[in-house]
């Protein structure tokens, strides 16, 4: 079956340095899965938080399923993520020690199951964002020059 990407969080790569990523499963309702199969998700303002010894993703917007009924849930509700206890403990240590954040970077189907990729992230300063944009623009200019030359 492979991997089918539902949504990417491009803003996360703009606002953060992503040091490490890990994959987690999600606890969802049936109508949410149906909506995700239609590609109706937005990771833009999403973030992860450890509450009560469990990992949750907040502000992940999954649009209500249009053919659903009263079972449709709140589009931005907190959803539990499924990770191994050792991974959760490691994440908790890193977030507490170094002031890092947990940011969802990608939402996808893997062998029929919804997975979310979580990045351990450090915030970028304004000058870091500008530097990233300059380097991307320089790479684009070089690629354009090479393409035009041949």
From Swiss-Prot:
Primary site of residence: cytoplasm
Top-rank taxon: Bacteria
Region (Disordered): 129-150
Protein keywords: Cytoplasm, RNA-binding
A Pfam match: SmpB
GO biological process terms on file: trans-translation
UniProt keyword RNA-binding, yes or no: yes
InterPro entries according to UniProt: SmpB, SsrA-bd_prot, SsrA-bd_prot_CS
Subcellular localization, as worded in the UniProt entry: Cytoplasm
Function field: Required for rescue of stalled ribosomes mediated by trans-translation. Binds to transfer-messenger RNA (tmRNA), required for stable association of tmRNA with ribosomes. tmRNA and SmpB together mimic tRNA shape, replacing the anticodon stem-loop with SmpB. tmRNA is encoded by the ssrA gene; the 2 termini fold to resemble tRNA(Ala) and it encodes a 'tag peptide', a short internal open reading frame. During trans-translation Ala-aminoacylated tmRNA acts like a tRNA, entering the A-site of stalled ribosomes, displacing the stalled mRNA.
Family: Belongs to the SmpB family.
HAMAP family: SmpB
Protein name per its UniProtKB record: SsrA-binding protein
Species for this entry: Syntrophotalea carbinolica (strain DSM 2380 / NBRC 103641 / GraBd1) (Pelobacter carbinolicus)
Lineage start: Bacteria, Pseudomonadati, Thermodesulfobacteriota, Desulfuromonadia, Desulfuromonadales
